[in-house]
Amino acid sequence: FIMMKSLIITLLCSFCLSTTNAQSYFRQCGIQLLTKQNGLSNNTLTGIYQDKAGFLWLGTDVGLSRYDGIHFHNYNLIDKEPRALTHLYETSNNLLWSHIANLNQIACFDKMRGIYMPLISPTPEVLQDIQDICVLQDKLYALTSNAIVELNMEKNADEIRLTAQPLID
């Protein structure tokens, strides 16, 4: 037991020293570490995207964070259940799309209004089984467990209607 305790203490001390050395090295190289202490919503990043205006959009497990080079503005998801927002993409209508990896769903954020948009579909089962997403030439594509689909968007004031058109079954 004493050997195990000594090993754990040694590993913890080594980790703390290496973290301190890493932070010092980053500062010397002009690299700024950004964390919750700087305003980031969560230290766990699951996606990153830079938009045309230069803002960095960071996916975390509590929502999106927008970084302007100085400040963070956080857009937390409504429910408090952890979600990994990955694969961030933007379409020309200022919508930021993200895959919610741990739920196999997608999220849509309206950058102009600063809100998450509800997604409505006549085939909701398609929206419950998304493995990955991609935006190509302003079109949203999704990979499900048994098909590749193009998701056609119709944006209303309060919601986005999605219809799925299978490309490959």
Question: Where are the model-predicted features located?
Answer:
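Carboxylate-rich, polar loop motifs that coordinate divalent cations or form catalytic acidic clusters
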Residues: I2-D169
